[in-house]
A protein has these predicted regions:
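P-loop NTPase switch module centered on the Walker A-proximal segment
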Residues: 1-81, 88-89, 115, 119
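P-loop NTPase catalytic nucleotide-binding module
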Residues: 77-157
Length: 157
């Protein structure tokens, strides 16, 4: 999204964790403090909010989600939903948000996008998602390689 929104200048290095600016966050590969970045996409301003996933940061998650109009649920195509996914997704669903599910890393060997899709659906059912929330949009792709597709999940692998 940040590439598409032209957050970076041509030729600017955009590798790494853009929103994880804290040394401890970069070292551990986790988000501790919520961050935001704004992009413009086809005349619409989109604020991207990165929240911590762990329940120890619950207050931070709730504070940020209360400002959101929607959410992206980013899930690894091999690992599927992680334990912290449950906590943040539950908070988002309770606030009435309808996630767009992003299954990332479908370019990796042994990825399981079909199974991960089912795992996300089952998790949302376990969290008492509404019928509307269960009718979520899903996209598949590789953030590392800079592409996403809303094609049928079997055709992108």
């Amino acid at each position: 999204m940040m590439l598409a929104g032209k957050l970076f200048r041509d030729g600017q290095d955009n590798s790494g964790e853009v929103l994880d600016s804290n040394d401890l966050e970069r070292e551990r590969g986790i988000t501790i403090l919520s961050k935001n970045v704004s992009i413009n996409w086809k005349g619409t301003k989109i604020n991207i909010l990165d929240t911590p996933g762990h329940s120890d940061f619950g207050g931070e998650v709730e504070r940020v989600l209360n400002m959101a109009d929607g959410c992206l649920l980013l899930v690894d195509a091999f690992e599927g939903p992680m334990p912290q996914t449950r906590f943040v997704l539950q908070k988002a669903l309770q606030l009435g948000l309808k996630p767009i599910v992003v299954v990332n890393k479908v370019d990796k060997p042994n990825c399981r996008p079909e199974e991960v899709y089912e795992m996300v659906f089952d998790l949302m059912c376990d969290l008492d998602a509404t019928e509307e929330q269960l009718d979520f949009t899903v996209v598949y792709g590789s953030a590392k390689n800079g592409w996403m597709s809303d094609e049928d999940r079997k055709s992108v692998v």
